[in-house]
UniProtKB/Swiss-Prot annotation:
UniProt organism field: Paracoccus denitrificans (strain Pd 1222)
GO annotation terms (biological process): translation
Similarity annotation: Belongs to the bacterial ribosomal protein bL25 family. CTC subfamily.
Keyword Ribonucleoprotein: yes
Keyword annotations: Ribonucleoprotein, Ribosomal protein, RNA-binding, rRNA-binding
Gene Ontology MF terms: 5S rRNA binding; structural constituent of ribosome
HAMAP family named among the record's database cross-references: Ribosomal_bL25_CTC
SUPFAM superfamilies to which the protein is assigned, alphabetical: Ribosomal protein L25-like
Signal peptide as annotated in the record: none
Protein name (record): Large ribosomal subunit protein bL25
Quaternary data: Part of the 50S ribosomal subunit; part of the 5S rRNA/L5/L18/L25 subcomplex. Contacts the 5S rRNA. Binds to the 5S rRNA independently of L5 and L18.
């Protein structure tokens, strides 16, 4: 299932240059520009509070947005730069790049863990420790997966799940060439305490 692309509502901005940008800010807007895909740059402005909320939510720069401007066709964009006030650290200008449907882009994709009831390690009281609830992947703009799935069937206490253990959708790959950890199954605290006591007893016996 393709991932739902969040909307980002903006307005067309008639003027360009510093004067027009200052006017936009006085009106509670953040001026910006949309470029790329072989088309003319499009000046826009976004409502300040709406943009600030999205920026503070995180992952703004690595999210694919469906840009909606009244009177124009929706376009898929990614943010390529946010200028901020040096004192207040608030956005003063924003740049977006248009994406063609075949464009490859880096995005964070949710990790879903299934068949937890089929994992012996969890049945014994182990805990699923999620190291990466999202994974940054290289995907095609027209076919972004909703999530990637980790099958926990047969997983035991002490098992570790790496990215290479996950079957990724066709055409999708990690952004980094390393077999990083996604999650592991940790022993319950009682079992860890018993193991530690047993190890300590063995150590004392050896020393004696």
């Amino acid at each position: 299932m393709a991932k739902e692309i969040p909307d980002l509502v903006a307005e067309a901005r008639a003027g360009t240059g510093k004067g027009a940008a200052r006017q936009a800010r006085r009106e509670g807007k953040v001026p910006g520009i949309v470029y790329g895909d072989g088309k003319e740059p499009q000046p826009i402005q976004i409502e300040f509070n709406s943009l600030l909320t999205k920026l503070r939510a995180g992952r703004f720069m690595s999210t694919l947005w469906n840009l909606k401007v009244e009177g124009q066709d929706d376009v898929r964009v990614v943010c390529r730069g946010v200028q901020r006030d040096v004192v207040k650290d608030l956005p003063t200008h924003i740049d977006f790049m248009r994406l063609h449907r075949n464009t490859r882009v880096n995005l964070f994709i949710h990790v879903n863990f299934e068949n937890q009831d089929e994992a012996p390690g969890l049945k014994r009281g182990g805990t699923l420790v999620v190291v990466r609830p999202e994974v940054e992947l290289v995907v095609t703009a027209s076919d972004i997966p909703e999530q990637i799935t980790v099958d926990l069937t047969g997983k035991q206490i002490g098992d570790t799940i790496h990215i290479n253990d996950v079957v990724l959708p066709k055409g999708v790959k990690p952004t980094i060439d390393r077999n990083f950890v996604i999650a592991n199954i940790a022993a319950p605290s009682g079992l860890r305490s018993a193991d530690n006591e047993e190890a300590a007893a063995e150590s004392e016996a050896t020393e004696a």
